[in-house]
A protein has these predicted regions:
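Amide-forming acyltransferase catalytic core, primarily the GNAT-like/NAT-type
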Residues: 174-295
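Active-site rim helix/loop that mediates acceptor-substrate recognition in acyltransferases
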Residues: 28-81, 224-273
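Conserved acetyl-CoA-binding loop-helix of GNAT-fold acetyltransferases
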Residues: 92-118, 122-127, 138-140, 304-324
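Active-site/acyl-donor-binding loops of N-acyltransferases
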Residues: 137-152, 161, 165-197, 286-288, ...
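Conserved GNAT-family N-acetyltransferase fold
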Residues: 60, 71-73, 88, 93, ...
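Contiguous mid-protein beta-loop-alpha structural module that forms a pocket-lining wall or clamp
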Residues: 104-227
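Eukaryotic N-terminal targeting leaders
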Residues: 1-51, 123-151, 190-192, 398-402
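Conserved acetyl-CoA binding element of GNAT-fold acetyltransferases
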Residues: 85-97, 286-307
Length: 402
């Protein structure tokens, strides 16, 4: 049997027929990605994302001779966290259950990466370009999202979240094996939260640059250049805001969410020494029943003081999660035990406390449990495998994935 490669991108493939085909693709992959949503609701939300011209996305998919869609991958470009860098997120990886164990998605991923990096269309075995494949539009789209100066600099990285362990290592992706997800289920929430205005502050999207730059609070920076997408964090502000807004649009979160979703973090100062500060950022995860704390900064030296800070952060995070989840359609089908707050020790930034000490403090705070690598493994691949040693993610990679 032979298989044909197709592509659709939301910059040039916007005809009525293109949109109709895109809906079929979303319906096909919905069994793996819709969660509690009805297929039609999943289609509607994803089509909003596809039809949002301010964002960029491209799908490649294989069809069998009988017209079945058998494998799918989506490539989403994101501004890198270093200036002048780009992150290509490999997502929506899907194989039709009737066509599994044939290596089809592996062939598709290899072809897509090679096509992006070299422009060639070499094929593996029984795969060919579909007769309707619009190569000129496809190349024009890639040129649009990959400016020539970035391509020449090779400051491009592929990233993904794997739910199949290190499977993607065969494509050159390096796992962030030191990621340990520490989780708190909603049935263990303490939502008795009231802001202590003398020592605490809710952080908002409007002034996130002020909080994120460490100079104001003398908080540490990560400066190891090998840790891609980690240093020079002040470069993340436009990308963070863009990704956050994308999440709101994707999930149809309107007025009710904005009241609570305007907050992006929590600042707490020492009660006796105001110079001792901890900042925790918070954001919805791409699984709608999960909330992630994607970065924690502290200059606190004493573990007991930090434990107090974390207890307050936990109460804030539980309050935030409850408010946000109450506004998301279809979450009523989830039990509290399936609603989760997440943080990783690799997202902890401190010059005085170790990541192990951070993990120990968290897991000694009511209800938090270390789940190890958990449900997702962040992975990264250098453009053309050009770096020696290869880049690695110094944190959970979440900033790259939203």
């Amino acid at each position: 049997m032979s298989y044909s490669i197709h592509q659709l991108n939301n910059k040039f493939n916007r005809s009525d027929n293109d949109l109709k085909t895109m809906k079929v693709v979303y319906a096909t992959i919905s069994s793996s990605f819709k969660g509690p949503l009805e297929t039609s609701d999943f289609q509607h939300l994803e089509m909003q994302h596809y039809e949002d011209y301010t964002a960029s996305t491209q799908f490649f998919y294989l069809t069998a001779e009988n017209g079945d869609i058998v494998s799918v991958v989506e490539i989403v470009p994101r501004q890198g966290l270093h200036q002048g860098t780009l992150n290509l997120l490999l997502t929506m990886v899907f194989t039709n259950p009737d066509y599994r164990k044939r290596g089809l998605v592996a062939k598709l991923i290899n072809w897509v990466i090679n096509f992006y990096e070299t422009g060639t269309t070499d094929f593996d075995g029984a795969i060919k370009l579909a007769d309707c494949f619009e190569m000129d539009q496809c190349r024009e789209y890639i040129s649009l999202i990959l400016p020539e100066e970035i391509v020449k600099s090779e400051k491009i990285h592929w990233t993904l979240y794997s739910i199949v362990g290190e499977y993607y290592a065969r494509f050159g992706f390096n796992p962030c094996n030191d990621t340990e997800w520490i989780e708190l289920c909603a049935d263990n929430f303490d939502v008795d939260f009231e802001l202590k205005e003398d020592t605490e502050k809710l952080l908002t999207m409007d002034n996130i640059p002020t909080y994120f730059t460490a100079q104001k609070y003398n908080l540490p920076h990560i400066e190891d250049e090998r840790f891609n997408n980690c240093a020079l964090e002040e470069a993340t502000f436009p990308g963070f805001v863009q990704r956050y807004q994308s999440y709101l649009n994707l999930n149809g979160l309107k007025e009710e969410f904005s009241e609570h979703g305007k907050y992006c973090g929590f600042l707490i100062s020492g009660e006796l020494d105001a110079s001792q500060k901890t900042i925790a950022f918070i954001c919805p995860f791409f699984f709608m029943n999960r909330i992630v704390i994607p970065r924690v900064y502290t200059n606190v030296r004493d573990k007991n003081i930090f434990k107090h800070h974390w207890e307050r952060i936990s109460k804030f995070a539980a309050w935030y999660a409850k408010q946000v989840w109450a506004t998301i359609p279809n979450l009523s089908d989830y039990e509290d035990a399936d609603k989760v707050l997440m943080v990783t020790s690799s997202d902890f930034v401190s010059e005085t406390l170790t990541r192990q000490e951070f993990a120990d403090v968290i897991t000694s705070t009511g209800g938090w449990e270390n789940r190890g690598q958990g449900i997702v493994l962040p992975m990264i691949r250098d453009w053309k495998l050009s770096r020696k040693p290869p880049s690695r993610l110094a944190h959970s990679g979440y900033w790259s994935f939203m």
